[in-house]
Amino acid sequence: MKWKVQLYVGGTTFYENVHAVNRLDAIETAKARNPKARVIATNPDLSS
């Protein structure tokens, strides 16, 4: 499943789209790509 993780770093917010089985794996993947970022929101991406 695709997840849309909203991250915050350096005064800006941005989205990271990741493929993960569940919400916690999506957050872990997004944090691995952006270790200094803070997670704001995590939502499933239902668009095809």
Residue ranges of model-derived segments:
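A short, exposed loop/beta-hairpin motif centered on an aromatic-Gly-Thr core
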Residues: 12-22
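Secondary-structure boundary/capping motif
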Residues: 1-2, 30-33
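Hydrophobic beta-strand residues in large extracellular and virion-surface proteins
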Residues: 5-7, 20, 39
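Short aromatic-glycine-(Arg/Gly/Cys) micro-motifs in beta-strand/loop hairpins
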Residues: 1-13
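Short acidic, gly/pro-rich beta-turn/loop elements at beta-sheet edges
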Residues: 15, 28, 40
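Short, mixed-charge low-complexity intrinsically disordered segments
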Residues: 33-48
